[in-house]
Amino acid sequence: MLKMANTKKKLICLLICMMAPFVFGGTCRAENPFFQSFEKRRERMVRTQIEARGITNKKVLKALRKVERHKFVPKEYQRQAYGDYPLPIGEGQTISQPYIVALMTEVLDLDSTKKVLEIGTGSGYQAAILAEICESVCTIELIGVLGKKAEKLLADLGYENINVKIGDGYQGWKEHGPFDAIIVTCAPSHIPQPLQDQLAEGGKMVIPVGKKFTQELVLLTKHKGKIKKKDVIPVRFVPMMGKDGKAY
């Protein structure tokens, strides 16, 4: 009986091995994101998460295909780096969902002549995407540990057109302004006046605004000194904090 049972087990295992290529399309390892190289995962991310949702700007798509997102997350999350979700990067902060990075970049309508200010450096990933498209990027991070880590990583990756500052993003970076575009990756309860003042004529700002659970991604355009506002989509970002530890 034992010999018969072992024979049956072997036959079942053999049958599973024979059927696997048909059940999983013949290339189960190649098509399963878990077994793919980072390059293939990145291409899959752009194709299924970004292009499939209507992002068409060629400069944005090219940047997303080039920048290695897995290098901007802790090692334990690298295999999930190209998934359709944010990931923790330490200090209670996250790297944004790839689609949101793409959307926020696209609505700014950037090119190689633009000077951009980013509020909330975080991992440095968004700054890298911007640097692939724009002339220069100034980015501010409140949390020193994150800012210094991002600055080193960006330098190691060869980005020479990114300036990193540790400071209060609400105040912007007046010395380097005005900016053709401003991108804010943390949510204040209102639009900071210093950032509006540092936006160049004709410039655009994309910013999540609202309280913890009710935020709207807003696109602002400065025209003849006045700010025009357009709602984009509901979002959820970490709150914009000041040096005193209080949310704006």
Outline where the language-model segments fall.
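Ala/Thr-enriched low-complexity intrinsically disordered regions
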Residues: 5-7, 20, 27
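Alpha-helical interaction segments
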Residues: 12-14, 72, 169
